[in-house]
Amino acid sequence: MSKVLAIAQFTLLEALRTRVLWLVLAMLMLLGLGSLFVQHVAITETTRLQTGFLAASARMAVIFVLCLHVASSMVREFNDKGVDLLLSLDLPRAGYFFGKLLGFAGLALIIAAMTSLALAWLAPLPGVALWGMSLACELILMAALTLFCIITFVQIMPAISFVFGFYLLARSIDAVKLLSGSQLLNPNAWSTKLTGWLVDALATILPNLGRFTQTGWLVNGPEAISALGFVVLQTSVYGLLLVLAGLYDLYRKNL
């Protein structure tokens, strides 16, 4: 257990040395200035528009930064043979995997806290707290997905492409379902039925990220605690699947 915690500690230390948190802070400051511009341009409901813009853009920005950091960190370790060196010691592969995942999860919690503080002056604190906890779950889930993809592909470009394709599809799957069931389409056409089946299958397989970190919690007030329960449940289920897949892929590699 101490070795796992040591790997997690060095993973967090690497994030500090590569100035990831400074990058997140700079992005939040720039987006905050952009939200002020949106507030001045808007004619009505200026605060709601400012909050919505800052929340949506900050969520996408921090997810992009975290996933890119996880990918670049892991690829650098593979290329520098750091993984081989660690696994040559008395350390099981599962210990290395959980150490890295724990470190990236800690970084995700710090980034979620920073992002929530950036919104605390615009929205009620209960809504910000719910939004921040949901963002932390979303970041942890995306970090686990990126870790799995890097172990599988061992290259940044295919891994990041898959991660963001997955994220955009999971985030918009409800809208895709509505479009596939539109009354403007011919319900008897085979193409419409096939598309509907494919979309339903994807909606069953993918996590419903559209219900994560909703901007409405900030501008309309927080929902019931059951909304956070759904987020935690989805994060736990899909996080466990990603951990199992990542461990399987790591153990079958010849390192």
Annotate the PLM regions.
Residues 18, 247-255:
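Membrane-interface capping segments at transmembrane-helix boundaries
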Residues 41-43, 165-248:
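Terminal transmembrane helical anchor/hairpin motif
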Residues 15-17, 140, 152-153, 172:
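Transmembrane helix irregularities
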Residues 32-73, 97-159, 178:
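Secretory targeting signals
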Residues 93-94:
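Alpha-helix N-cap/start motif
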